[in-house]
């Protein structure tokens, strides 16, 4: 296994001193000597309330904002000012902003770039130089970013590139947030265990170039996430077909915005699909 980005990384001023609220991410914590599940404070529990806000606005403590930028790219922001962009393509909008972390998958050019912004401190590729894959465990204090390797179909034939892609997991503010990437197969038992309990999952719902709809629904049932954020949908009704299939098991919220702000305390009681509308970042406008 090719290991990268392990240990403490550079972070914006103040974040190194911001402790990370432990998540209950790892499903096998009970089997690891000395490991414990995080306990919620008294009175904590899932609530249906979550609020929307513009990307890059200041965040209250223990809140995380997820903004849908385009295709499979989301901006994840923390109260301490850390940020990560998933499936980074080199363009996130008409802005000079750059994230602290960029993750990439190599399924297509719409999921990665060979020329990332050199100002980004941590660019995490979801693939390694060999079939052994890559291992990321980037600890920025307030946020931990790690990956679980998955296989990928070749873009040129029917062969399979073992460990050629990754599911990225972001542990922040007590939440476990997963980005399934360009997923081509259902995870096996070991991969599910490595992912752990995802509170929030970003899932490709095109039903064609990634998993077909029945298999993606099986994955989401297995993950049992509180919030599902659909991504990677195209014209022709792929989003509508997913929403129709999910509506029997999930509450559906059509936000009409590109951002949602969540906390461990505000997770919905019933598993919920939150449909965000993609929108690139823009430079702040003068008042």
Model-predicted regions and their roles:
Residues 2-153, 175-180, 199-203, 236, ...:
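Metallo-beta-lactamase
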Residues 152-223, 234, 238-240:
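Active-site-proximal loop/helix segments of hydrolase catalytic cores
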Residues 228:
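Residue-level signal for inorganic ion chemistry
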């Amino acid at each position: 296994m090719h290991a990268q980005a392990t240990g403490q990384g550079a972070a914006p001023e103040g974040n190194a001193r911001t402790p990370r609220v432990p998540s209950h991410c790892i499903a096998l914590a009970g089997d690891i000597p000395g490991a414990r599940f995080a306990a919620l404070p008294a009175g904590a529990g899932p609530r249906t309330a979550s609020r929307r806000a513009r990307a890059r606005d200041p965040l209250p403590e223990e809140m995380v904002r997820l903004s849908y930028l385009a295709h499979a790219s989301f901006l994840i922001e923390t109260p301490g000012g850390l940020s990560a962009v998933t499936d980074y393509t080199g363009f996130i909008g008409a802005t000079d902003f750059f994230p602290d972390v960029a993750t990439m998958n190599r399924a297509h050019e719409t999921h990665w770039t060979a020329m990332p912004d050199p100002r980004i401190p941590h660019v995490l590729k979801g693939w390694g130089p060999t079939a052994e894959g890559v291992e990321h465990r980037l600890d920025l204090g307030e946020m931990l970013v790690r990956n679980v390797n998955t296989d990928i179909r070749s873009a040129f034939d029917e062969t399979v590139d073992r460990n050629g892609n990754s599911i990225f997991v972001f542990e922040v503010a007590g939440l476990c947030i997963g980005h399934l990437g360009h997923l081509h197969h259902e995870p096996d038992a070991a991969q599910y265990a490595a992912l752990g309990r995802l509170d929030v999952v970003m899932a490709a719902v095109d039903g064609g170039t990634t998993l077909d709809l029945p298999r993606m629904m099986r994955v989401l049932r297995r993950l049992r996430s509180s919030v599902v954020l659909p991504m990677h949908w195209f014209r022709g009704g792929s989003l509508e077909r997913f929403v129709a299939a999910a509506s029997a098991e999930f509450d559906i919220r059509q936000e009409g915005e590109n951002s949602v702000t969540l906390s461990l305390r505000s997770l919905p009681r019933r598993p919920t699909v939150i449909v965000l509308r993609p929108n690139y970042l823009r430079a702040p406008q003068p008042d």
